[in-house]
C-alpha cells in the first residue's frame, strides 16, 4: 500500500513577486499537482519562476465536487499544493472544504506560510494588534452591509475588512455613519505593489479622501478600524448577558428591547449578536 501524500497550503505574493519564499518555490516545483483558484493567474506566476506543474482549477463553485477526487489522489500517494490568486489560501478564498476533507481522511496538511493582506495591513496600521477580528468582505447589498456593521459597532477589538474598489467609497460612508465619524481607521491599498498607499485618520477624513481622489478608488483594499471604546464595549457585554437571561422567558425581540433599556446597549447589537 502506498504512503498517502501531503497537502501543502502555499501562500503566494499579494503583489511583489519577490515575496514568494524559497520554500514555497521548492514545494511548487516538486508536488504532483497544484490546485489553483484561477489556473491562468497561477500559470503566469509559475512561469515567472520557471516552474511547470499540472494545474487543477479549484474554486468556490466546484470545491465541494472536486474535494473527493483530490483526496483520492492524496491517498494514492500524490503530493498536492493549494494556492489562491494571492496571499494565503482559505483567507476569504476557497480551500476550507478540501482541508477539512483531507484532515478527516487522515491526510497530512501542512502550511507553507507567506504573504497575507490582512496581516500585512495590520502590521503597518498603527492600530492595536494584540486582539483583532477579521470580517472578510462585507455584504455587497447596502442594507445587509449596514446590518452587519451595526452588529459590529461595539466590538472592542480592532476590526479588519476586505473591500472591492467599486464599493470602497460607500463602505467608508457606512462605516463613518454607523461606527461614528471620529473612529480611527486605516485604508491600505495595493499592498506591496507599485501604487501602494496606506492612509490613516478618522473614518470621516478617510471617506472624504477616497471620495475625492479617483486613484484611491482603484485596486484592492484592506480597511482596519479601531475597536469601540471600553465604555461601549462594557455596555454591550452587559447587554448581552442580560439579553441571554431574558431570552429564556421572552421572545428574542422583546428580550433585546428590554435588555437595551436596562443596560443602555443598542438593541440591534444585542438581537444580532
UniProtKB/Swiss-Prot annotation:
This protein's UniProt keywords: Cytoplasm, Methyltransferase, rRNA processing, S-adenosyl-L-methionine, Transferase
Protein localization: Cytoplasm
Superkingdom of origin organism: Bacteria
Catalytic EC class: transferase
InterPro entries, sorted: 4pyrrol_Mease, 4pyrrol_Methylase_sf, 4pyrrole_Mease_sub1, 4pyrrole_Mease_sub2, rRNA_ssu_MeTfrase_I, RsmI_HTH, SAM_MeTrfase_RsmI_CS
PROSITE patterns: RSMI
Entry keyword annotation includes Magnesium: no
Documented EC number(s): 2.1.1.198
Pfam families associated with the record: RsmI_C, TP_methylase
One Gene Ontology term, aspect cellular component: cytoplasm
Catalysed reactions, as listed in the record: cytidine(1402) in 16S rRNA + S-adenosyl-L-methionine = 2'-O-methylcytidine(1402) in 16S rRNA + S-adenosyl-L-homocysteine + H(+)
GO MF term list: rRNA (cytosine-2'-O-)-methyltransferase activity
Family recorded in the similarity comment: Belongs to the methyltransferase superfamily. RsmI family.
Role noted for this protein: Catalyzes the 2'-O-methylation of the ribose of cytidine 1402 (C1402) in 16S rRNA.
HAMAP family in UniProt: 16SrRNA_methyltr_I
Protein name, as recorded: Ribosomal RNA small subunit methyltransferase I
Organism encoding this protein: Xylella fastidiosa (strain 9a5c)
Gene: rsmI
Amino acid at each position: 500500500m502506498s504512503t498517502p501524500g501531503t497537502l501543502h497550503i502555499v501562500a503566494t505574493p499579494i503583489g511583489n513577486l519577490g515575496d514568494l519564499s524559497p520554500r514555497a518555490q521548492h514545494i511548487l516545483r516538486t508536488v504532483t499537482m497544484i490546485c489553483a483558484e484561477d489556473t491562468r493567474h497561477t500559470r503566469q506566476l509559475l512561469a515567472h519562476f520557471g516552474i511547470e506543474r499540472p494545474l487543477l482549477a479549484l474554486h468556490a463553485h466546484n470545491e465541494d465536487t472536486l474535494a473527493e477526487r483530490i483526496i483520492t489522489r492524496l491517498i494514492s500517494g500524490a503530493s498536492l499544493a493549494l494556492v489562491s490568486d494571492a496571499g494565503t489560501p482559505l483567507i476569504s478564498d476557497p480551500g476550507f472544504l478540501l482541508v477539512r476533507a483531507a484532515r478527516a481522511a487522515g491526510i497530512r496538511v501542512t502550511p507553507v506560510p507567506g504573504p497575507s493582506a490582512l496581516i500585512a495591513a495590520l502590521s503597518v496600521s498603527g492600530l492595536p494588534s494584540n486582539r483583532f477580528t477579521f470580517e472578510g468582505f462585507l455584504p455587497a447589498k447596502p442594507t445587509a452591509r449596514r446590518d452587519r456593521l451595526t452588529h459590529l459597532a461595539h466590538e472592542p477589538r480592532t476590526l479588519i475588512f476586505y473591500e472591492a474598489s467599486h464599493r470602497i467609497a460607500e463602505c467608508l460612508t457606512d462605516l463613518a455613519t454607523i461606527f461614528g465619524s471620529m473612529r480611527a481607521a486605516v485604508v491600505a491599498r495595493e499592498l506591496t505593489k507599485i501604487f501602494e498607499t496606506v492612509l490613516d485618520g478618522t473614518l470621516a477624513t478617510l471617506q472624504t479622501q477616497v471620495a475625492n481622489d479617483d486613484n484611491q478608488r482603484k485596486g484592492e483594499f484592506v480597511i482596519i478600524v479601531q475597536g469601540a471604546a471600553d465604555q461601549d464595549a462594557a455596555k454591550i457585554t452587559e447587554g448581552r448577558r442580560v439579553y441571554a437571561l431574558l431570552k429564556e422567558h421572552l421572545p428574542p425581540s422583546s428580550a433585546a428591547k428590554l435588555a437595551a433599556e436596562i443596560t443602555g446597549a443598542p438593541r440591534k447589537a444585542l438581537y444580532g449578536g
